[in-house]
A protein has these predicted regions:
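Short alpha-helical donor nucleotide-sugar binding micro-motif in glycosyltransferases
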Residues: 55-56, 63-68
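A charged, aromatic-enriched C-terminal amphipathic alpha-helix characteristic of glycosyltransferases
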Residues: 132-162
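Short hydrophobic beta-strand element within catalytic cores of glycosyltransferases
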Residues: 93-96
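Single conserved hydrophobic/aromatic residue that forms the stacking wall/gate
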Residues: 1-12
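Conserved acidic donor-binding segment of nucleotide-sugar-dependent glycosyltransferases
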Residues: 109-118, 126-131
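Aromatic "clamp/platform" in nucleotide-sugar-dependent glycosyltransferases that forms part
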Residues: 76
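Nucleotide-activated donor-binding/catalytic signature segment of Leloir-type glycosyltransferases, i.e.
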Residues: 36-56
Length: 170
């Protein structure tokens, strides 16, 4: 199994590796934190379970999604990440942090709090262990992202803001 991951967090990775023996993490991209992640994975002795691709473009991205069982974006600072939408369009079930901007728009992505490593590990474990669950999120996610329009996304975000303002005024 493979899991495409973005962001930090060593604990959930170790928890998943303890529960699912044949999982591999694929980390795509190149950023300020990548060197830290590579060193940390080596320190933990789990480097053999990781593949660091560097920056991917075009067809490479689609190929990576085709090889993935789960896409994980536990980012706390992603205003509106497009990569979860790309994963869903490729038929890959998606796990994102509630704190990411895209969480407000998507219904068929598993959402966990960025700091809740147990919930993140449980979500990955669930999708890898129960194929029917993964297939449901993949198919519903594909339907959702295919029908996603920016006007609908903006309306959802506007509703969230209105709810927050209304709660603050009460």
């Amino acid at each position: 199994d493979s899991s495409t991951s973005r962001g930090l967090g060593d604990v959930y990775k170790r928890q998943v590796l303890q529960r699912v023996s044949d999982v591999r993490f694929v980390m795509a991209g190149s950023g300020d934190l990548m060197n830290h992640v590579v060193r940390r994975v080596a320190q933990l002795g789990i480097a053999d379970r990781f593949h660091f691709t560097g920056f991917l473009k075009g067809g490479e991205v689609q190929r990576m999604f085709r090889l993935s069982d789960v896409y994980v974006m536990p980012s706390v600072s992603e205003p509106f990440g497009i990569s979860p939408l790309e994963a869903m369009r490729s038929g890959v079930p998606v796990i994102i942090s509630r704190q990411s901007g895209v969480a407000e728009v998507l219904d068929y992505a598993i959402k966990v709090n960025y700091w809740d490593v147990d919930a993140l590990a449980d979500a990955i474990y669930g999708l890898l262990t129960y194929p029917a669950l993964g297939r449901m999120f993949a198919s519903k996610g594909l339907e959702e992202v295919t029908g996603l329009k920016w006007t609908n996304a903006a309306a959802k975000i506007k509703t969230v803001y209105e709810t927050v303002v209304a709660e603050a005024n009460n």
